[in-house]
Amino acid sequence: MDTPLLSDRERLIQALEASDQRRREHRADRIEWLALYEVTPPVVIGRPETMHMLREAREVFVDGHFVAALMMAMSFIEHTVVEELQLLGHVSGSPTFAQAIERAKEKKTFPPDWLLRAKTLSLRRNPFAHLKQGDHPHTLGARVRHEKKHPRVIVETDAKDAIELMYNFFVATLREDA
């Protein structure tokens, strides 16, 4: 019996269905993990860029794109820290993230342990955003050698820490409309 030839589109759909099936359990695990930290008020109004980063950090994390989740979560945190400092009159303009962290520490804008975690995660994010020498201590290769863990485990752990911290900053800066 002759099997009908499938179009490229039909083969693509079949491949996507198989991929979805293989990844479904892991995505469900990540959604359940996110539920421990995620806060979703009925209405949130904020800067469109910042709100998109919050949503995209969640989405790429669920899909297992851990470097992207780290990048998005840290971008959200940077926006949030700087915006809070601006709203409180502690800075004007757009300071660097390192400057914003230091200013937030001075002004006690956020808990010091959050700011320390944000600084650490920023250093871990930087080799993905800015090319570093191969032996730089924050590169993934150097961390794999030092921590003796698989790269995927390292970036997943970083992503989880960044996502959790992102939701901490999100909740801390929620305001009721007056």
Language-model regions: role of each:
Residues 13-17, 51-54, 74, 118, ...:
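Generic structural concept
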Residues 1-65:
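Charged alpha-helical initiation segments
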Residues 38-40, 107, 148:
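A short, mixed-charge helix-start or loop-turn motif at secondary-structure junctions
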Residues 85-123, 142:
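Short, charged amphipathic alpha-helical segments flanked by flexible coils
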Residues 18-22, 107, 172, 176:
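Surface-exposed polar/charged interaction patches
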Residues 57-58, 62-86:
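Short, hydrophobic, well-ordered secondary-structure elements
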Residues 64, 80-92, 128, 132-135:
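Amphipathic alpha-helical interaction segments
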Residues 112-178:
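Charge-enriched, short contiguous segments at helix-coil
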